[in-house]
């Protein structure tokens, strides 16, 4: 499982829509649906129940959401911490010398 899958799941959960989650992530709805199905297969549980065009969170989905949210928040925190340490920054400036 990777962070992209977790982000897709989190967005579907919060937006209650595969389509809205896909739009938020600039991908096709079918891609999000496939990723959620992949997570469900990997975990061996349903995270959402599909009822008459609506999605309902399962108990497993609620638990997984809380964990995904925490993991994604921690990832963002770590990335910000690392970026804020100037001693670790990659030097990207290059000099261009023009001779006549």
Residue map of PLM features:
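A short LG(V/I)-centered, amphipathic sequence patch enriched
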Residues: 40-57, 80
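Hydrophobic two-helix hairpin corresponding to the core of helix-turn-helix DNA-binding domains
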Residues: 9, 21-22, 58-61
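Alpha-helical linker/hinge and terminal dimerization helices associated
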Residues: 42-43, 64-89
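Residue cluster at the C-terminal edge of the helix-turn-helix DNA-binding motif
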Residues: 15, 24, 38-46
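Interdomain hinge and pocket-entrance segments immediately C-terminal to HTH DNA-binding domains
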Residues: 84-100
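Short helix-boundary/capping micro-motifs
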Residues: 12-28
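The N-cap/first-turn positions of alpha helices
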Residues: 2-5, 29, 61, 95
């Amino acid at each position: 499982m990777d962070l992209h899958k977790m982000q897709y799941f989190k967005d579907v959960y919060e937006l209650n829509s595969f389509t809205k989650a896909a739009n938020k992530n600039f991908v096709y709805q079918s891609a999000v649906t496939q990723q959620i199905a992949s997570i469900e297969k990997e975990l061996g549980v349903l995270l959402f129940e599909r009822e008459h065009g609506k999605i309902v969170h399962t108990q497993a989905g609620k638990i997984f959401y809380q964990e995904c949210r925490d993991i994604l928040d921690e990832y963002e925190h770590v990335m910000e911490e690392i970026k804020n340490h100037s001693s670790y920054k990659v030097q990207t400036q290059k000099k261009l010398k023009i001779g006549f």
